[in-house]
Amino acid sequence: MKTLLLTLVVVTIVCLDLGYTLKCNKLVPLFYKTCPAGKNLCYKIFMVATPKVPVKRGCIDVCPKNSALVKYVCCNTDRCN
């Protein structure tokens, strides 16, 4: 009986996500992905010429600097991009 209980506890721990995982939108916001460890920011990339149309979305570890052609927007809450 103790073995069965221990097995159930181990399976529960393995199946549950004990750590916080960030969820970021993919290019189409209806879909999202769970970010891997170490990637704790969501991002969205815009072309400066078309600032209302995102080119790419996802998970990232450090927010890159904007350039003359590309603007990055980063955030750190679920599906904020």
From Swiss-Prot:
InterPro entries per record: Cytotoxin_Cobra, Snake_3FTx, Snake_toxin-like_sf, Snake_toxin_con_site, Toxin_cobra-type
Biological process (GO), any one: killing of cells of another organism
Keyword Disulfide bond: yes
Species name: Naja kaouthia (Monocled cobra)
Keywords noted in UniProt: Cardiotoxin, Cytolysis, Disulfide bond, Membrane, Secreted, Signal, Target cell membrane, Target membrane, Toxin
Signal sequence, start to end: 1-21
Subunit structure comment from the entry: Monomer in solution; Homodimer and oligomer in the presence of negatively charged lipids forming a pore with a size ranging between 20 and 30 Angstroms.
Name of protein: Cytotoxin 2
